[in-house]
Design a protein with these regions (language model features):
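A beta-strand signature from Gram-negative outer-membrane beta-barrel systems
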Residues: 5, 30-76, 85
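Short acidic/polar hinge/loop motifs at secondary-structure boundaries
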Residues: 13-44, 130
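Flexible loop and strand-edge segments within Gram-negative outer membrane beta-barrel domains
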Residues: 121, 142-193, 208-239
Length: 240
């Protein structure tokens, strides 16, 4: 078995790897795009999957977004190491019990950089993500519009260093590295009760994922001066 075979699912939609700085072909990453503030439930299966998870080979992470508060408005903000985030939810029309939910997060370290606050490295991880859900009850079911998305980039530039003493622990000492990922997933779903013992659901959705990496070799002479910079490796991966 392998973590590469894990299936991620959000509101019955199979989604790409929902992590920032994810490597193409993997299912994990250092910072999750998912925020637990808008989840109602999550199930993790390691084997003996139900038939609905037919494409899974190693594991399943099934996530459910909750609907927003349909009675009153709520707003919150948070500043933490993993991100600075804003969250809002509330009724669209109180008499109809419809609701909205929206979340946004921005890299705290990137925010520090914009204020010229040094964090100990010039390779600052830059990322942001957002999510939303609109919920509309109907006579025999409901309509939901939902989506998540995230963008992340990091540049490790050893060519900016003027001496060997300036080199950091991060990355390789002989090359500039550029790495980035982005993803989006969303859709519209309609659920309808078919009598007292049956329920049907139709979902129209779209998913998109993009990963790229580039390495540039930095050649120097004995005085640490740059003599040449040579593209060494690069890849671009897109799944939609």
């Amino acid at each position: 078995n392998s973590p590469i075979g894990v299936l991620w699912r959000l509101d019955d939609l199979d989604i790409p790897n929902p992590n920032h700085f994810a490597i193409a072909g993997t299912t994990g990453g250092p910072v999750s795009v998912i925020n637990n503030k808008y989840l109602s439930n999550s199930d993790f299966f390691t084997g003996a999957f139900p038939a609905e998870y037919g494409n899974a080979t190693a594991g399943v992470f099934d996530l459910r977004m909750r609907k927003g508060n349909d009675e009153q408005y709520e707003f919150s903000g948070q500043l933490g190491f993993l991100g600075t985030e804003l969250f809002a939810e509330g009724p669209l029309r109180a008499d109809k019990k419809s609701s909205f939910l929206v979340s946004y997060r921005y890299s705290t370290l990137q925010l520090f950089e914009s204020f010229n606050i040094q964090i100990g490295t010039q390779a600052v991880p830059q990322y942001q993500d957002a999510a939303f859900k609109l919920h509309f009850p109907t006579k025999n079911g409901s309509i939901s519009v939902f989506g998540i998305g995230g963008i992340s980039n990091i540049d490790i530039l050893v060519s900016d260093f003027e001496s060997a003493e300036d080199l950091e622990l991060y990355g390789d000492s002989d090359r500039d590295q550029y790495f980035g990922t982005s993803l989006a997933a969303g859709g519209v779903s309609y659920g309808h009760r078919l009598g007292s013992k049956a329920f049907g659901k139709l979902t129209l959705a779209y998913t998109w994922q993009d990963n790229h990496a580039d390495h540039v070799l930095v050649n120097r002479d004995s005085s640490f001066a740059i003599t040449s910079m040579v593209p060494n490796m690069g890849y671009f991966y897109r799944d939609q």
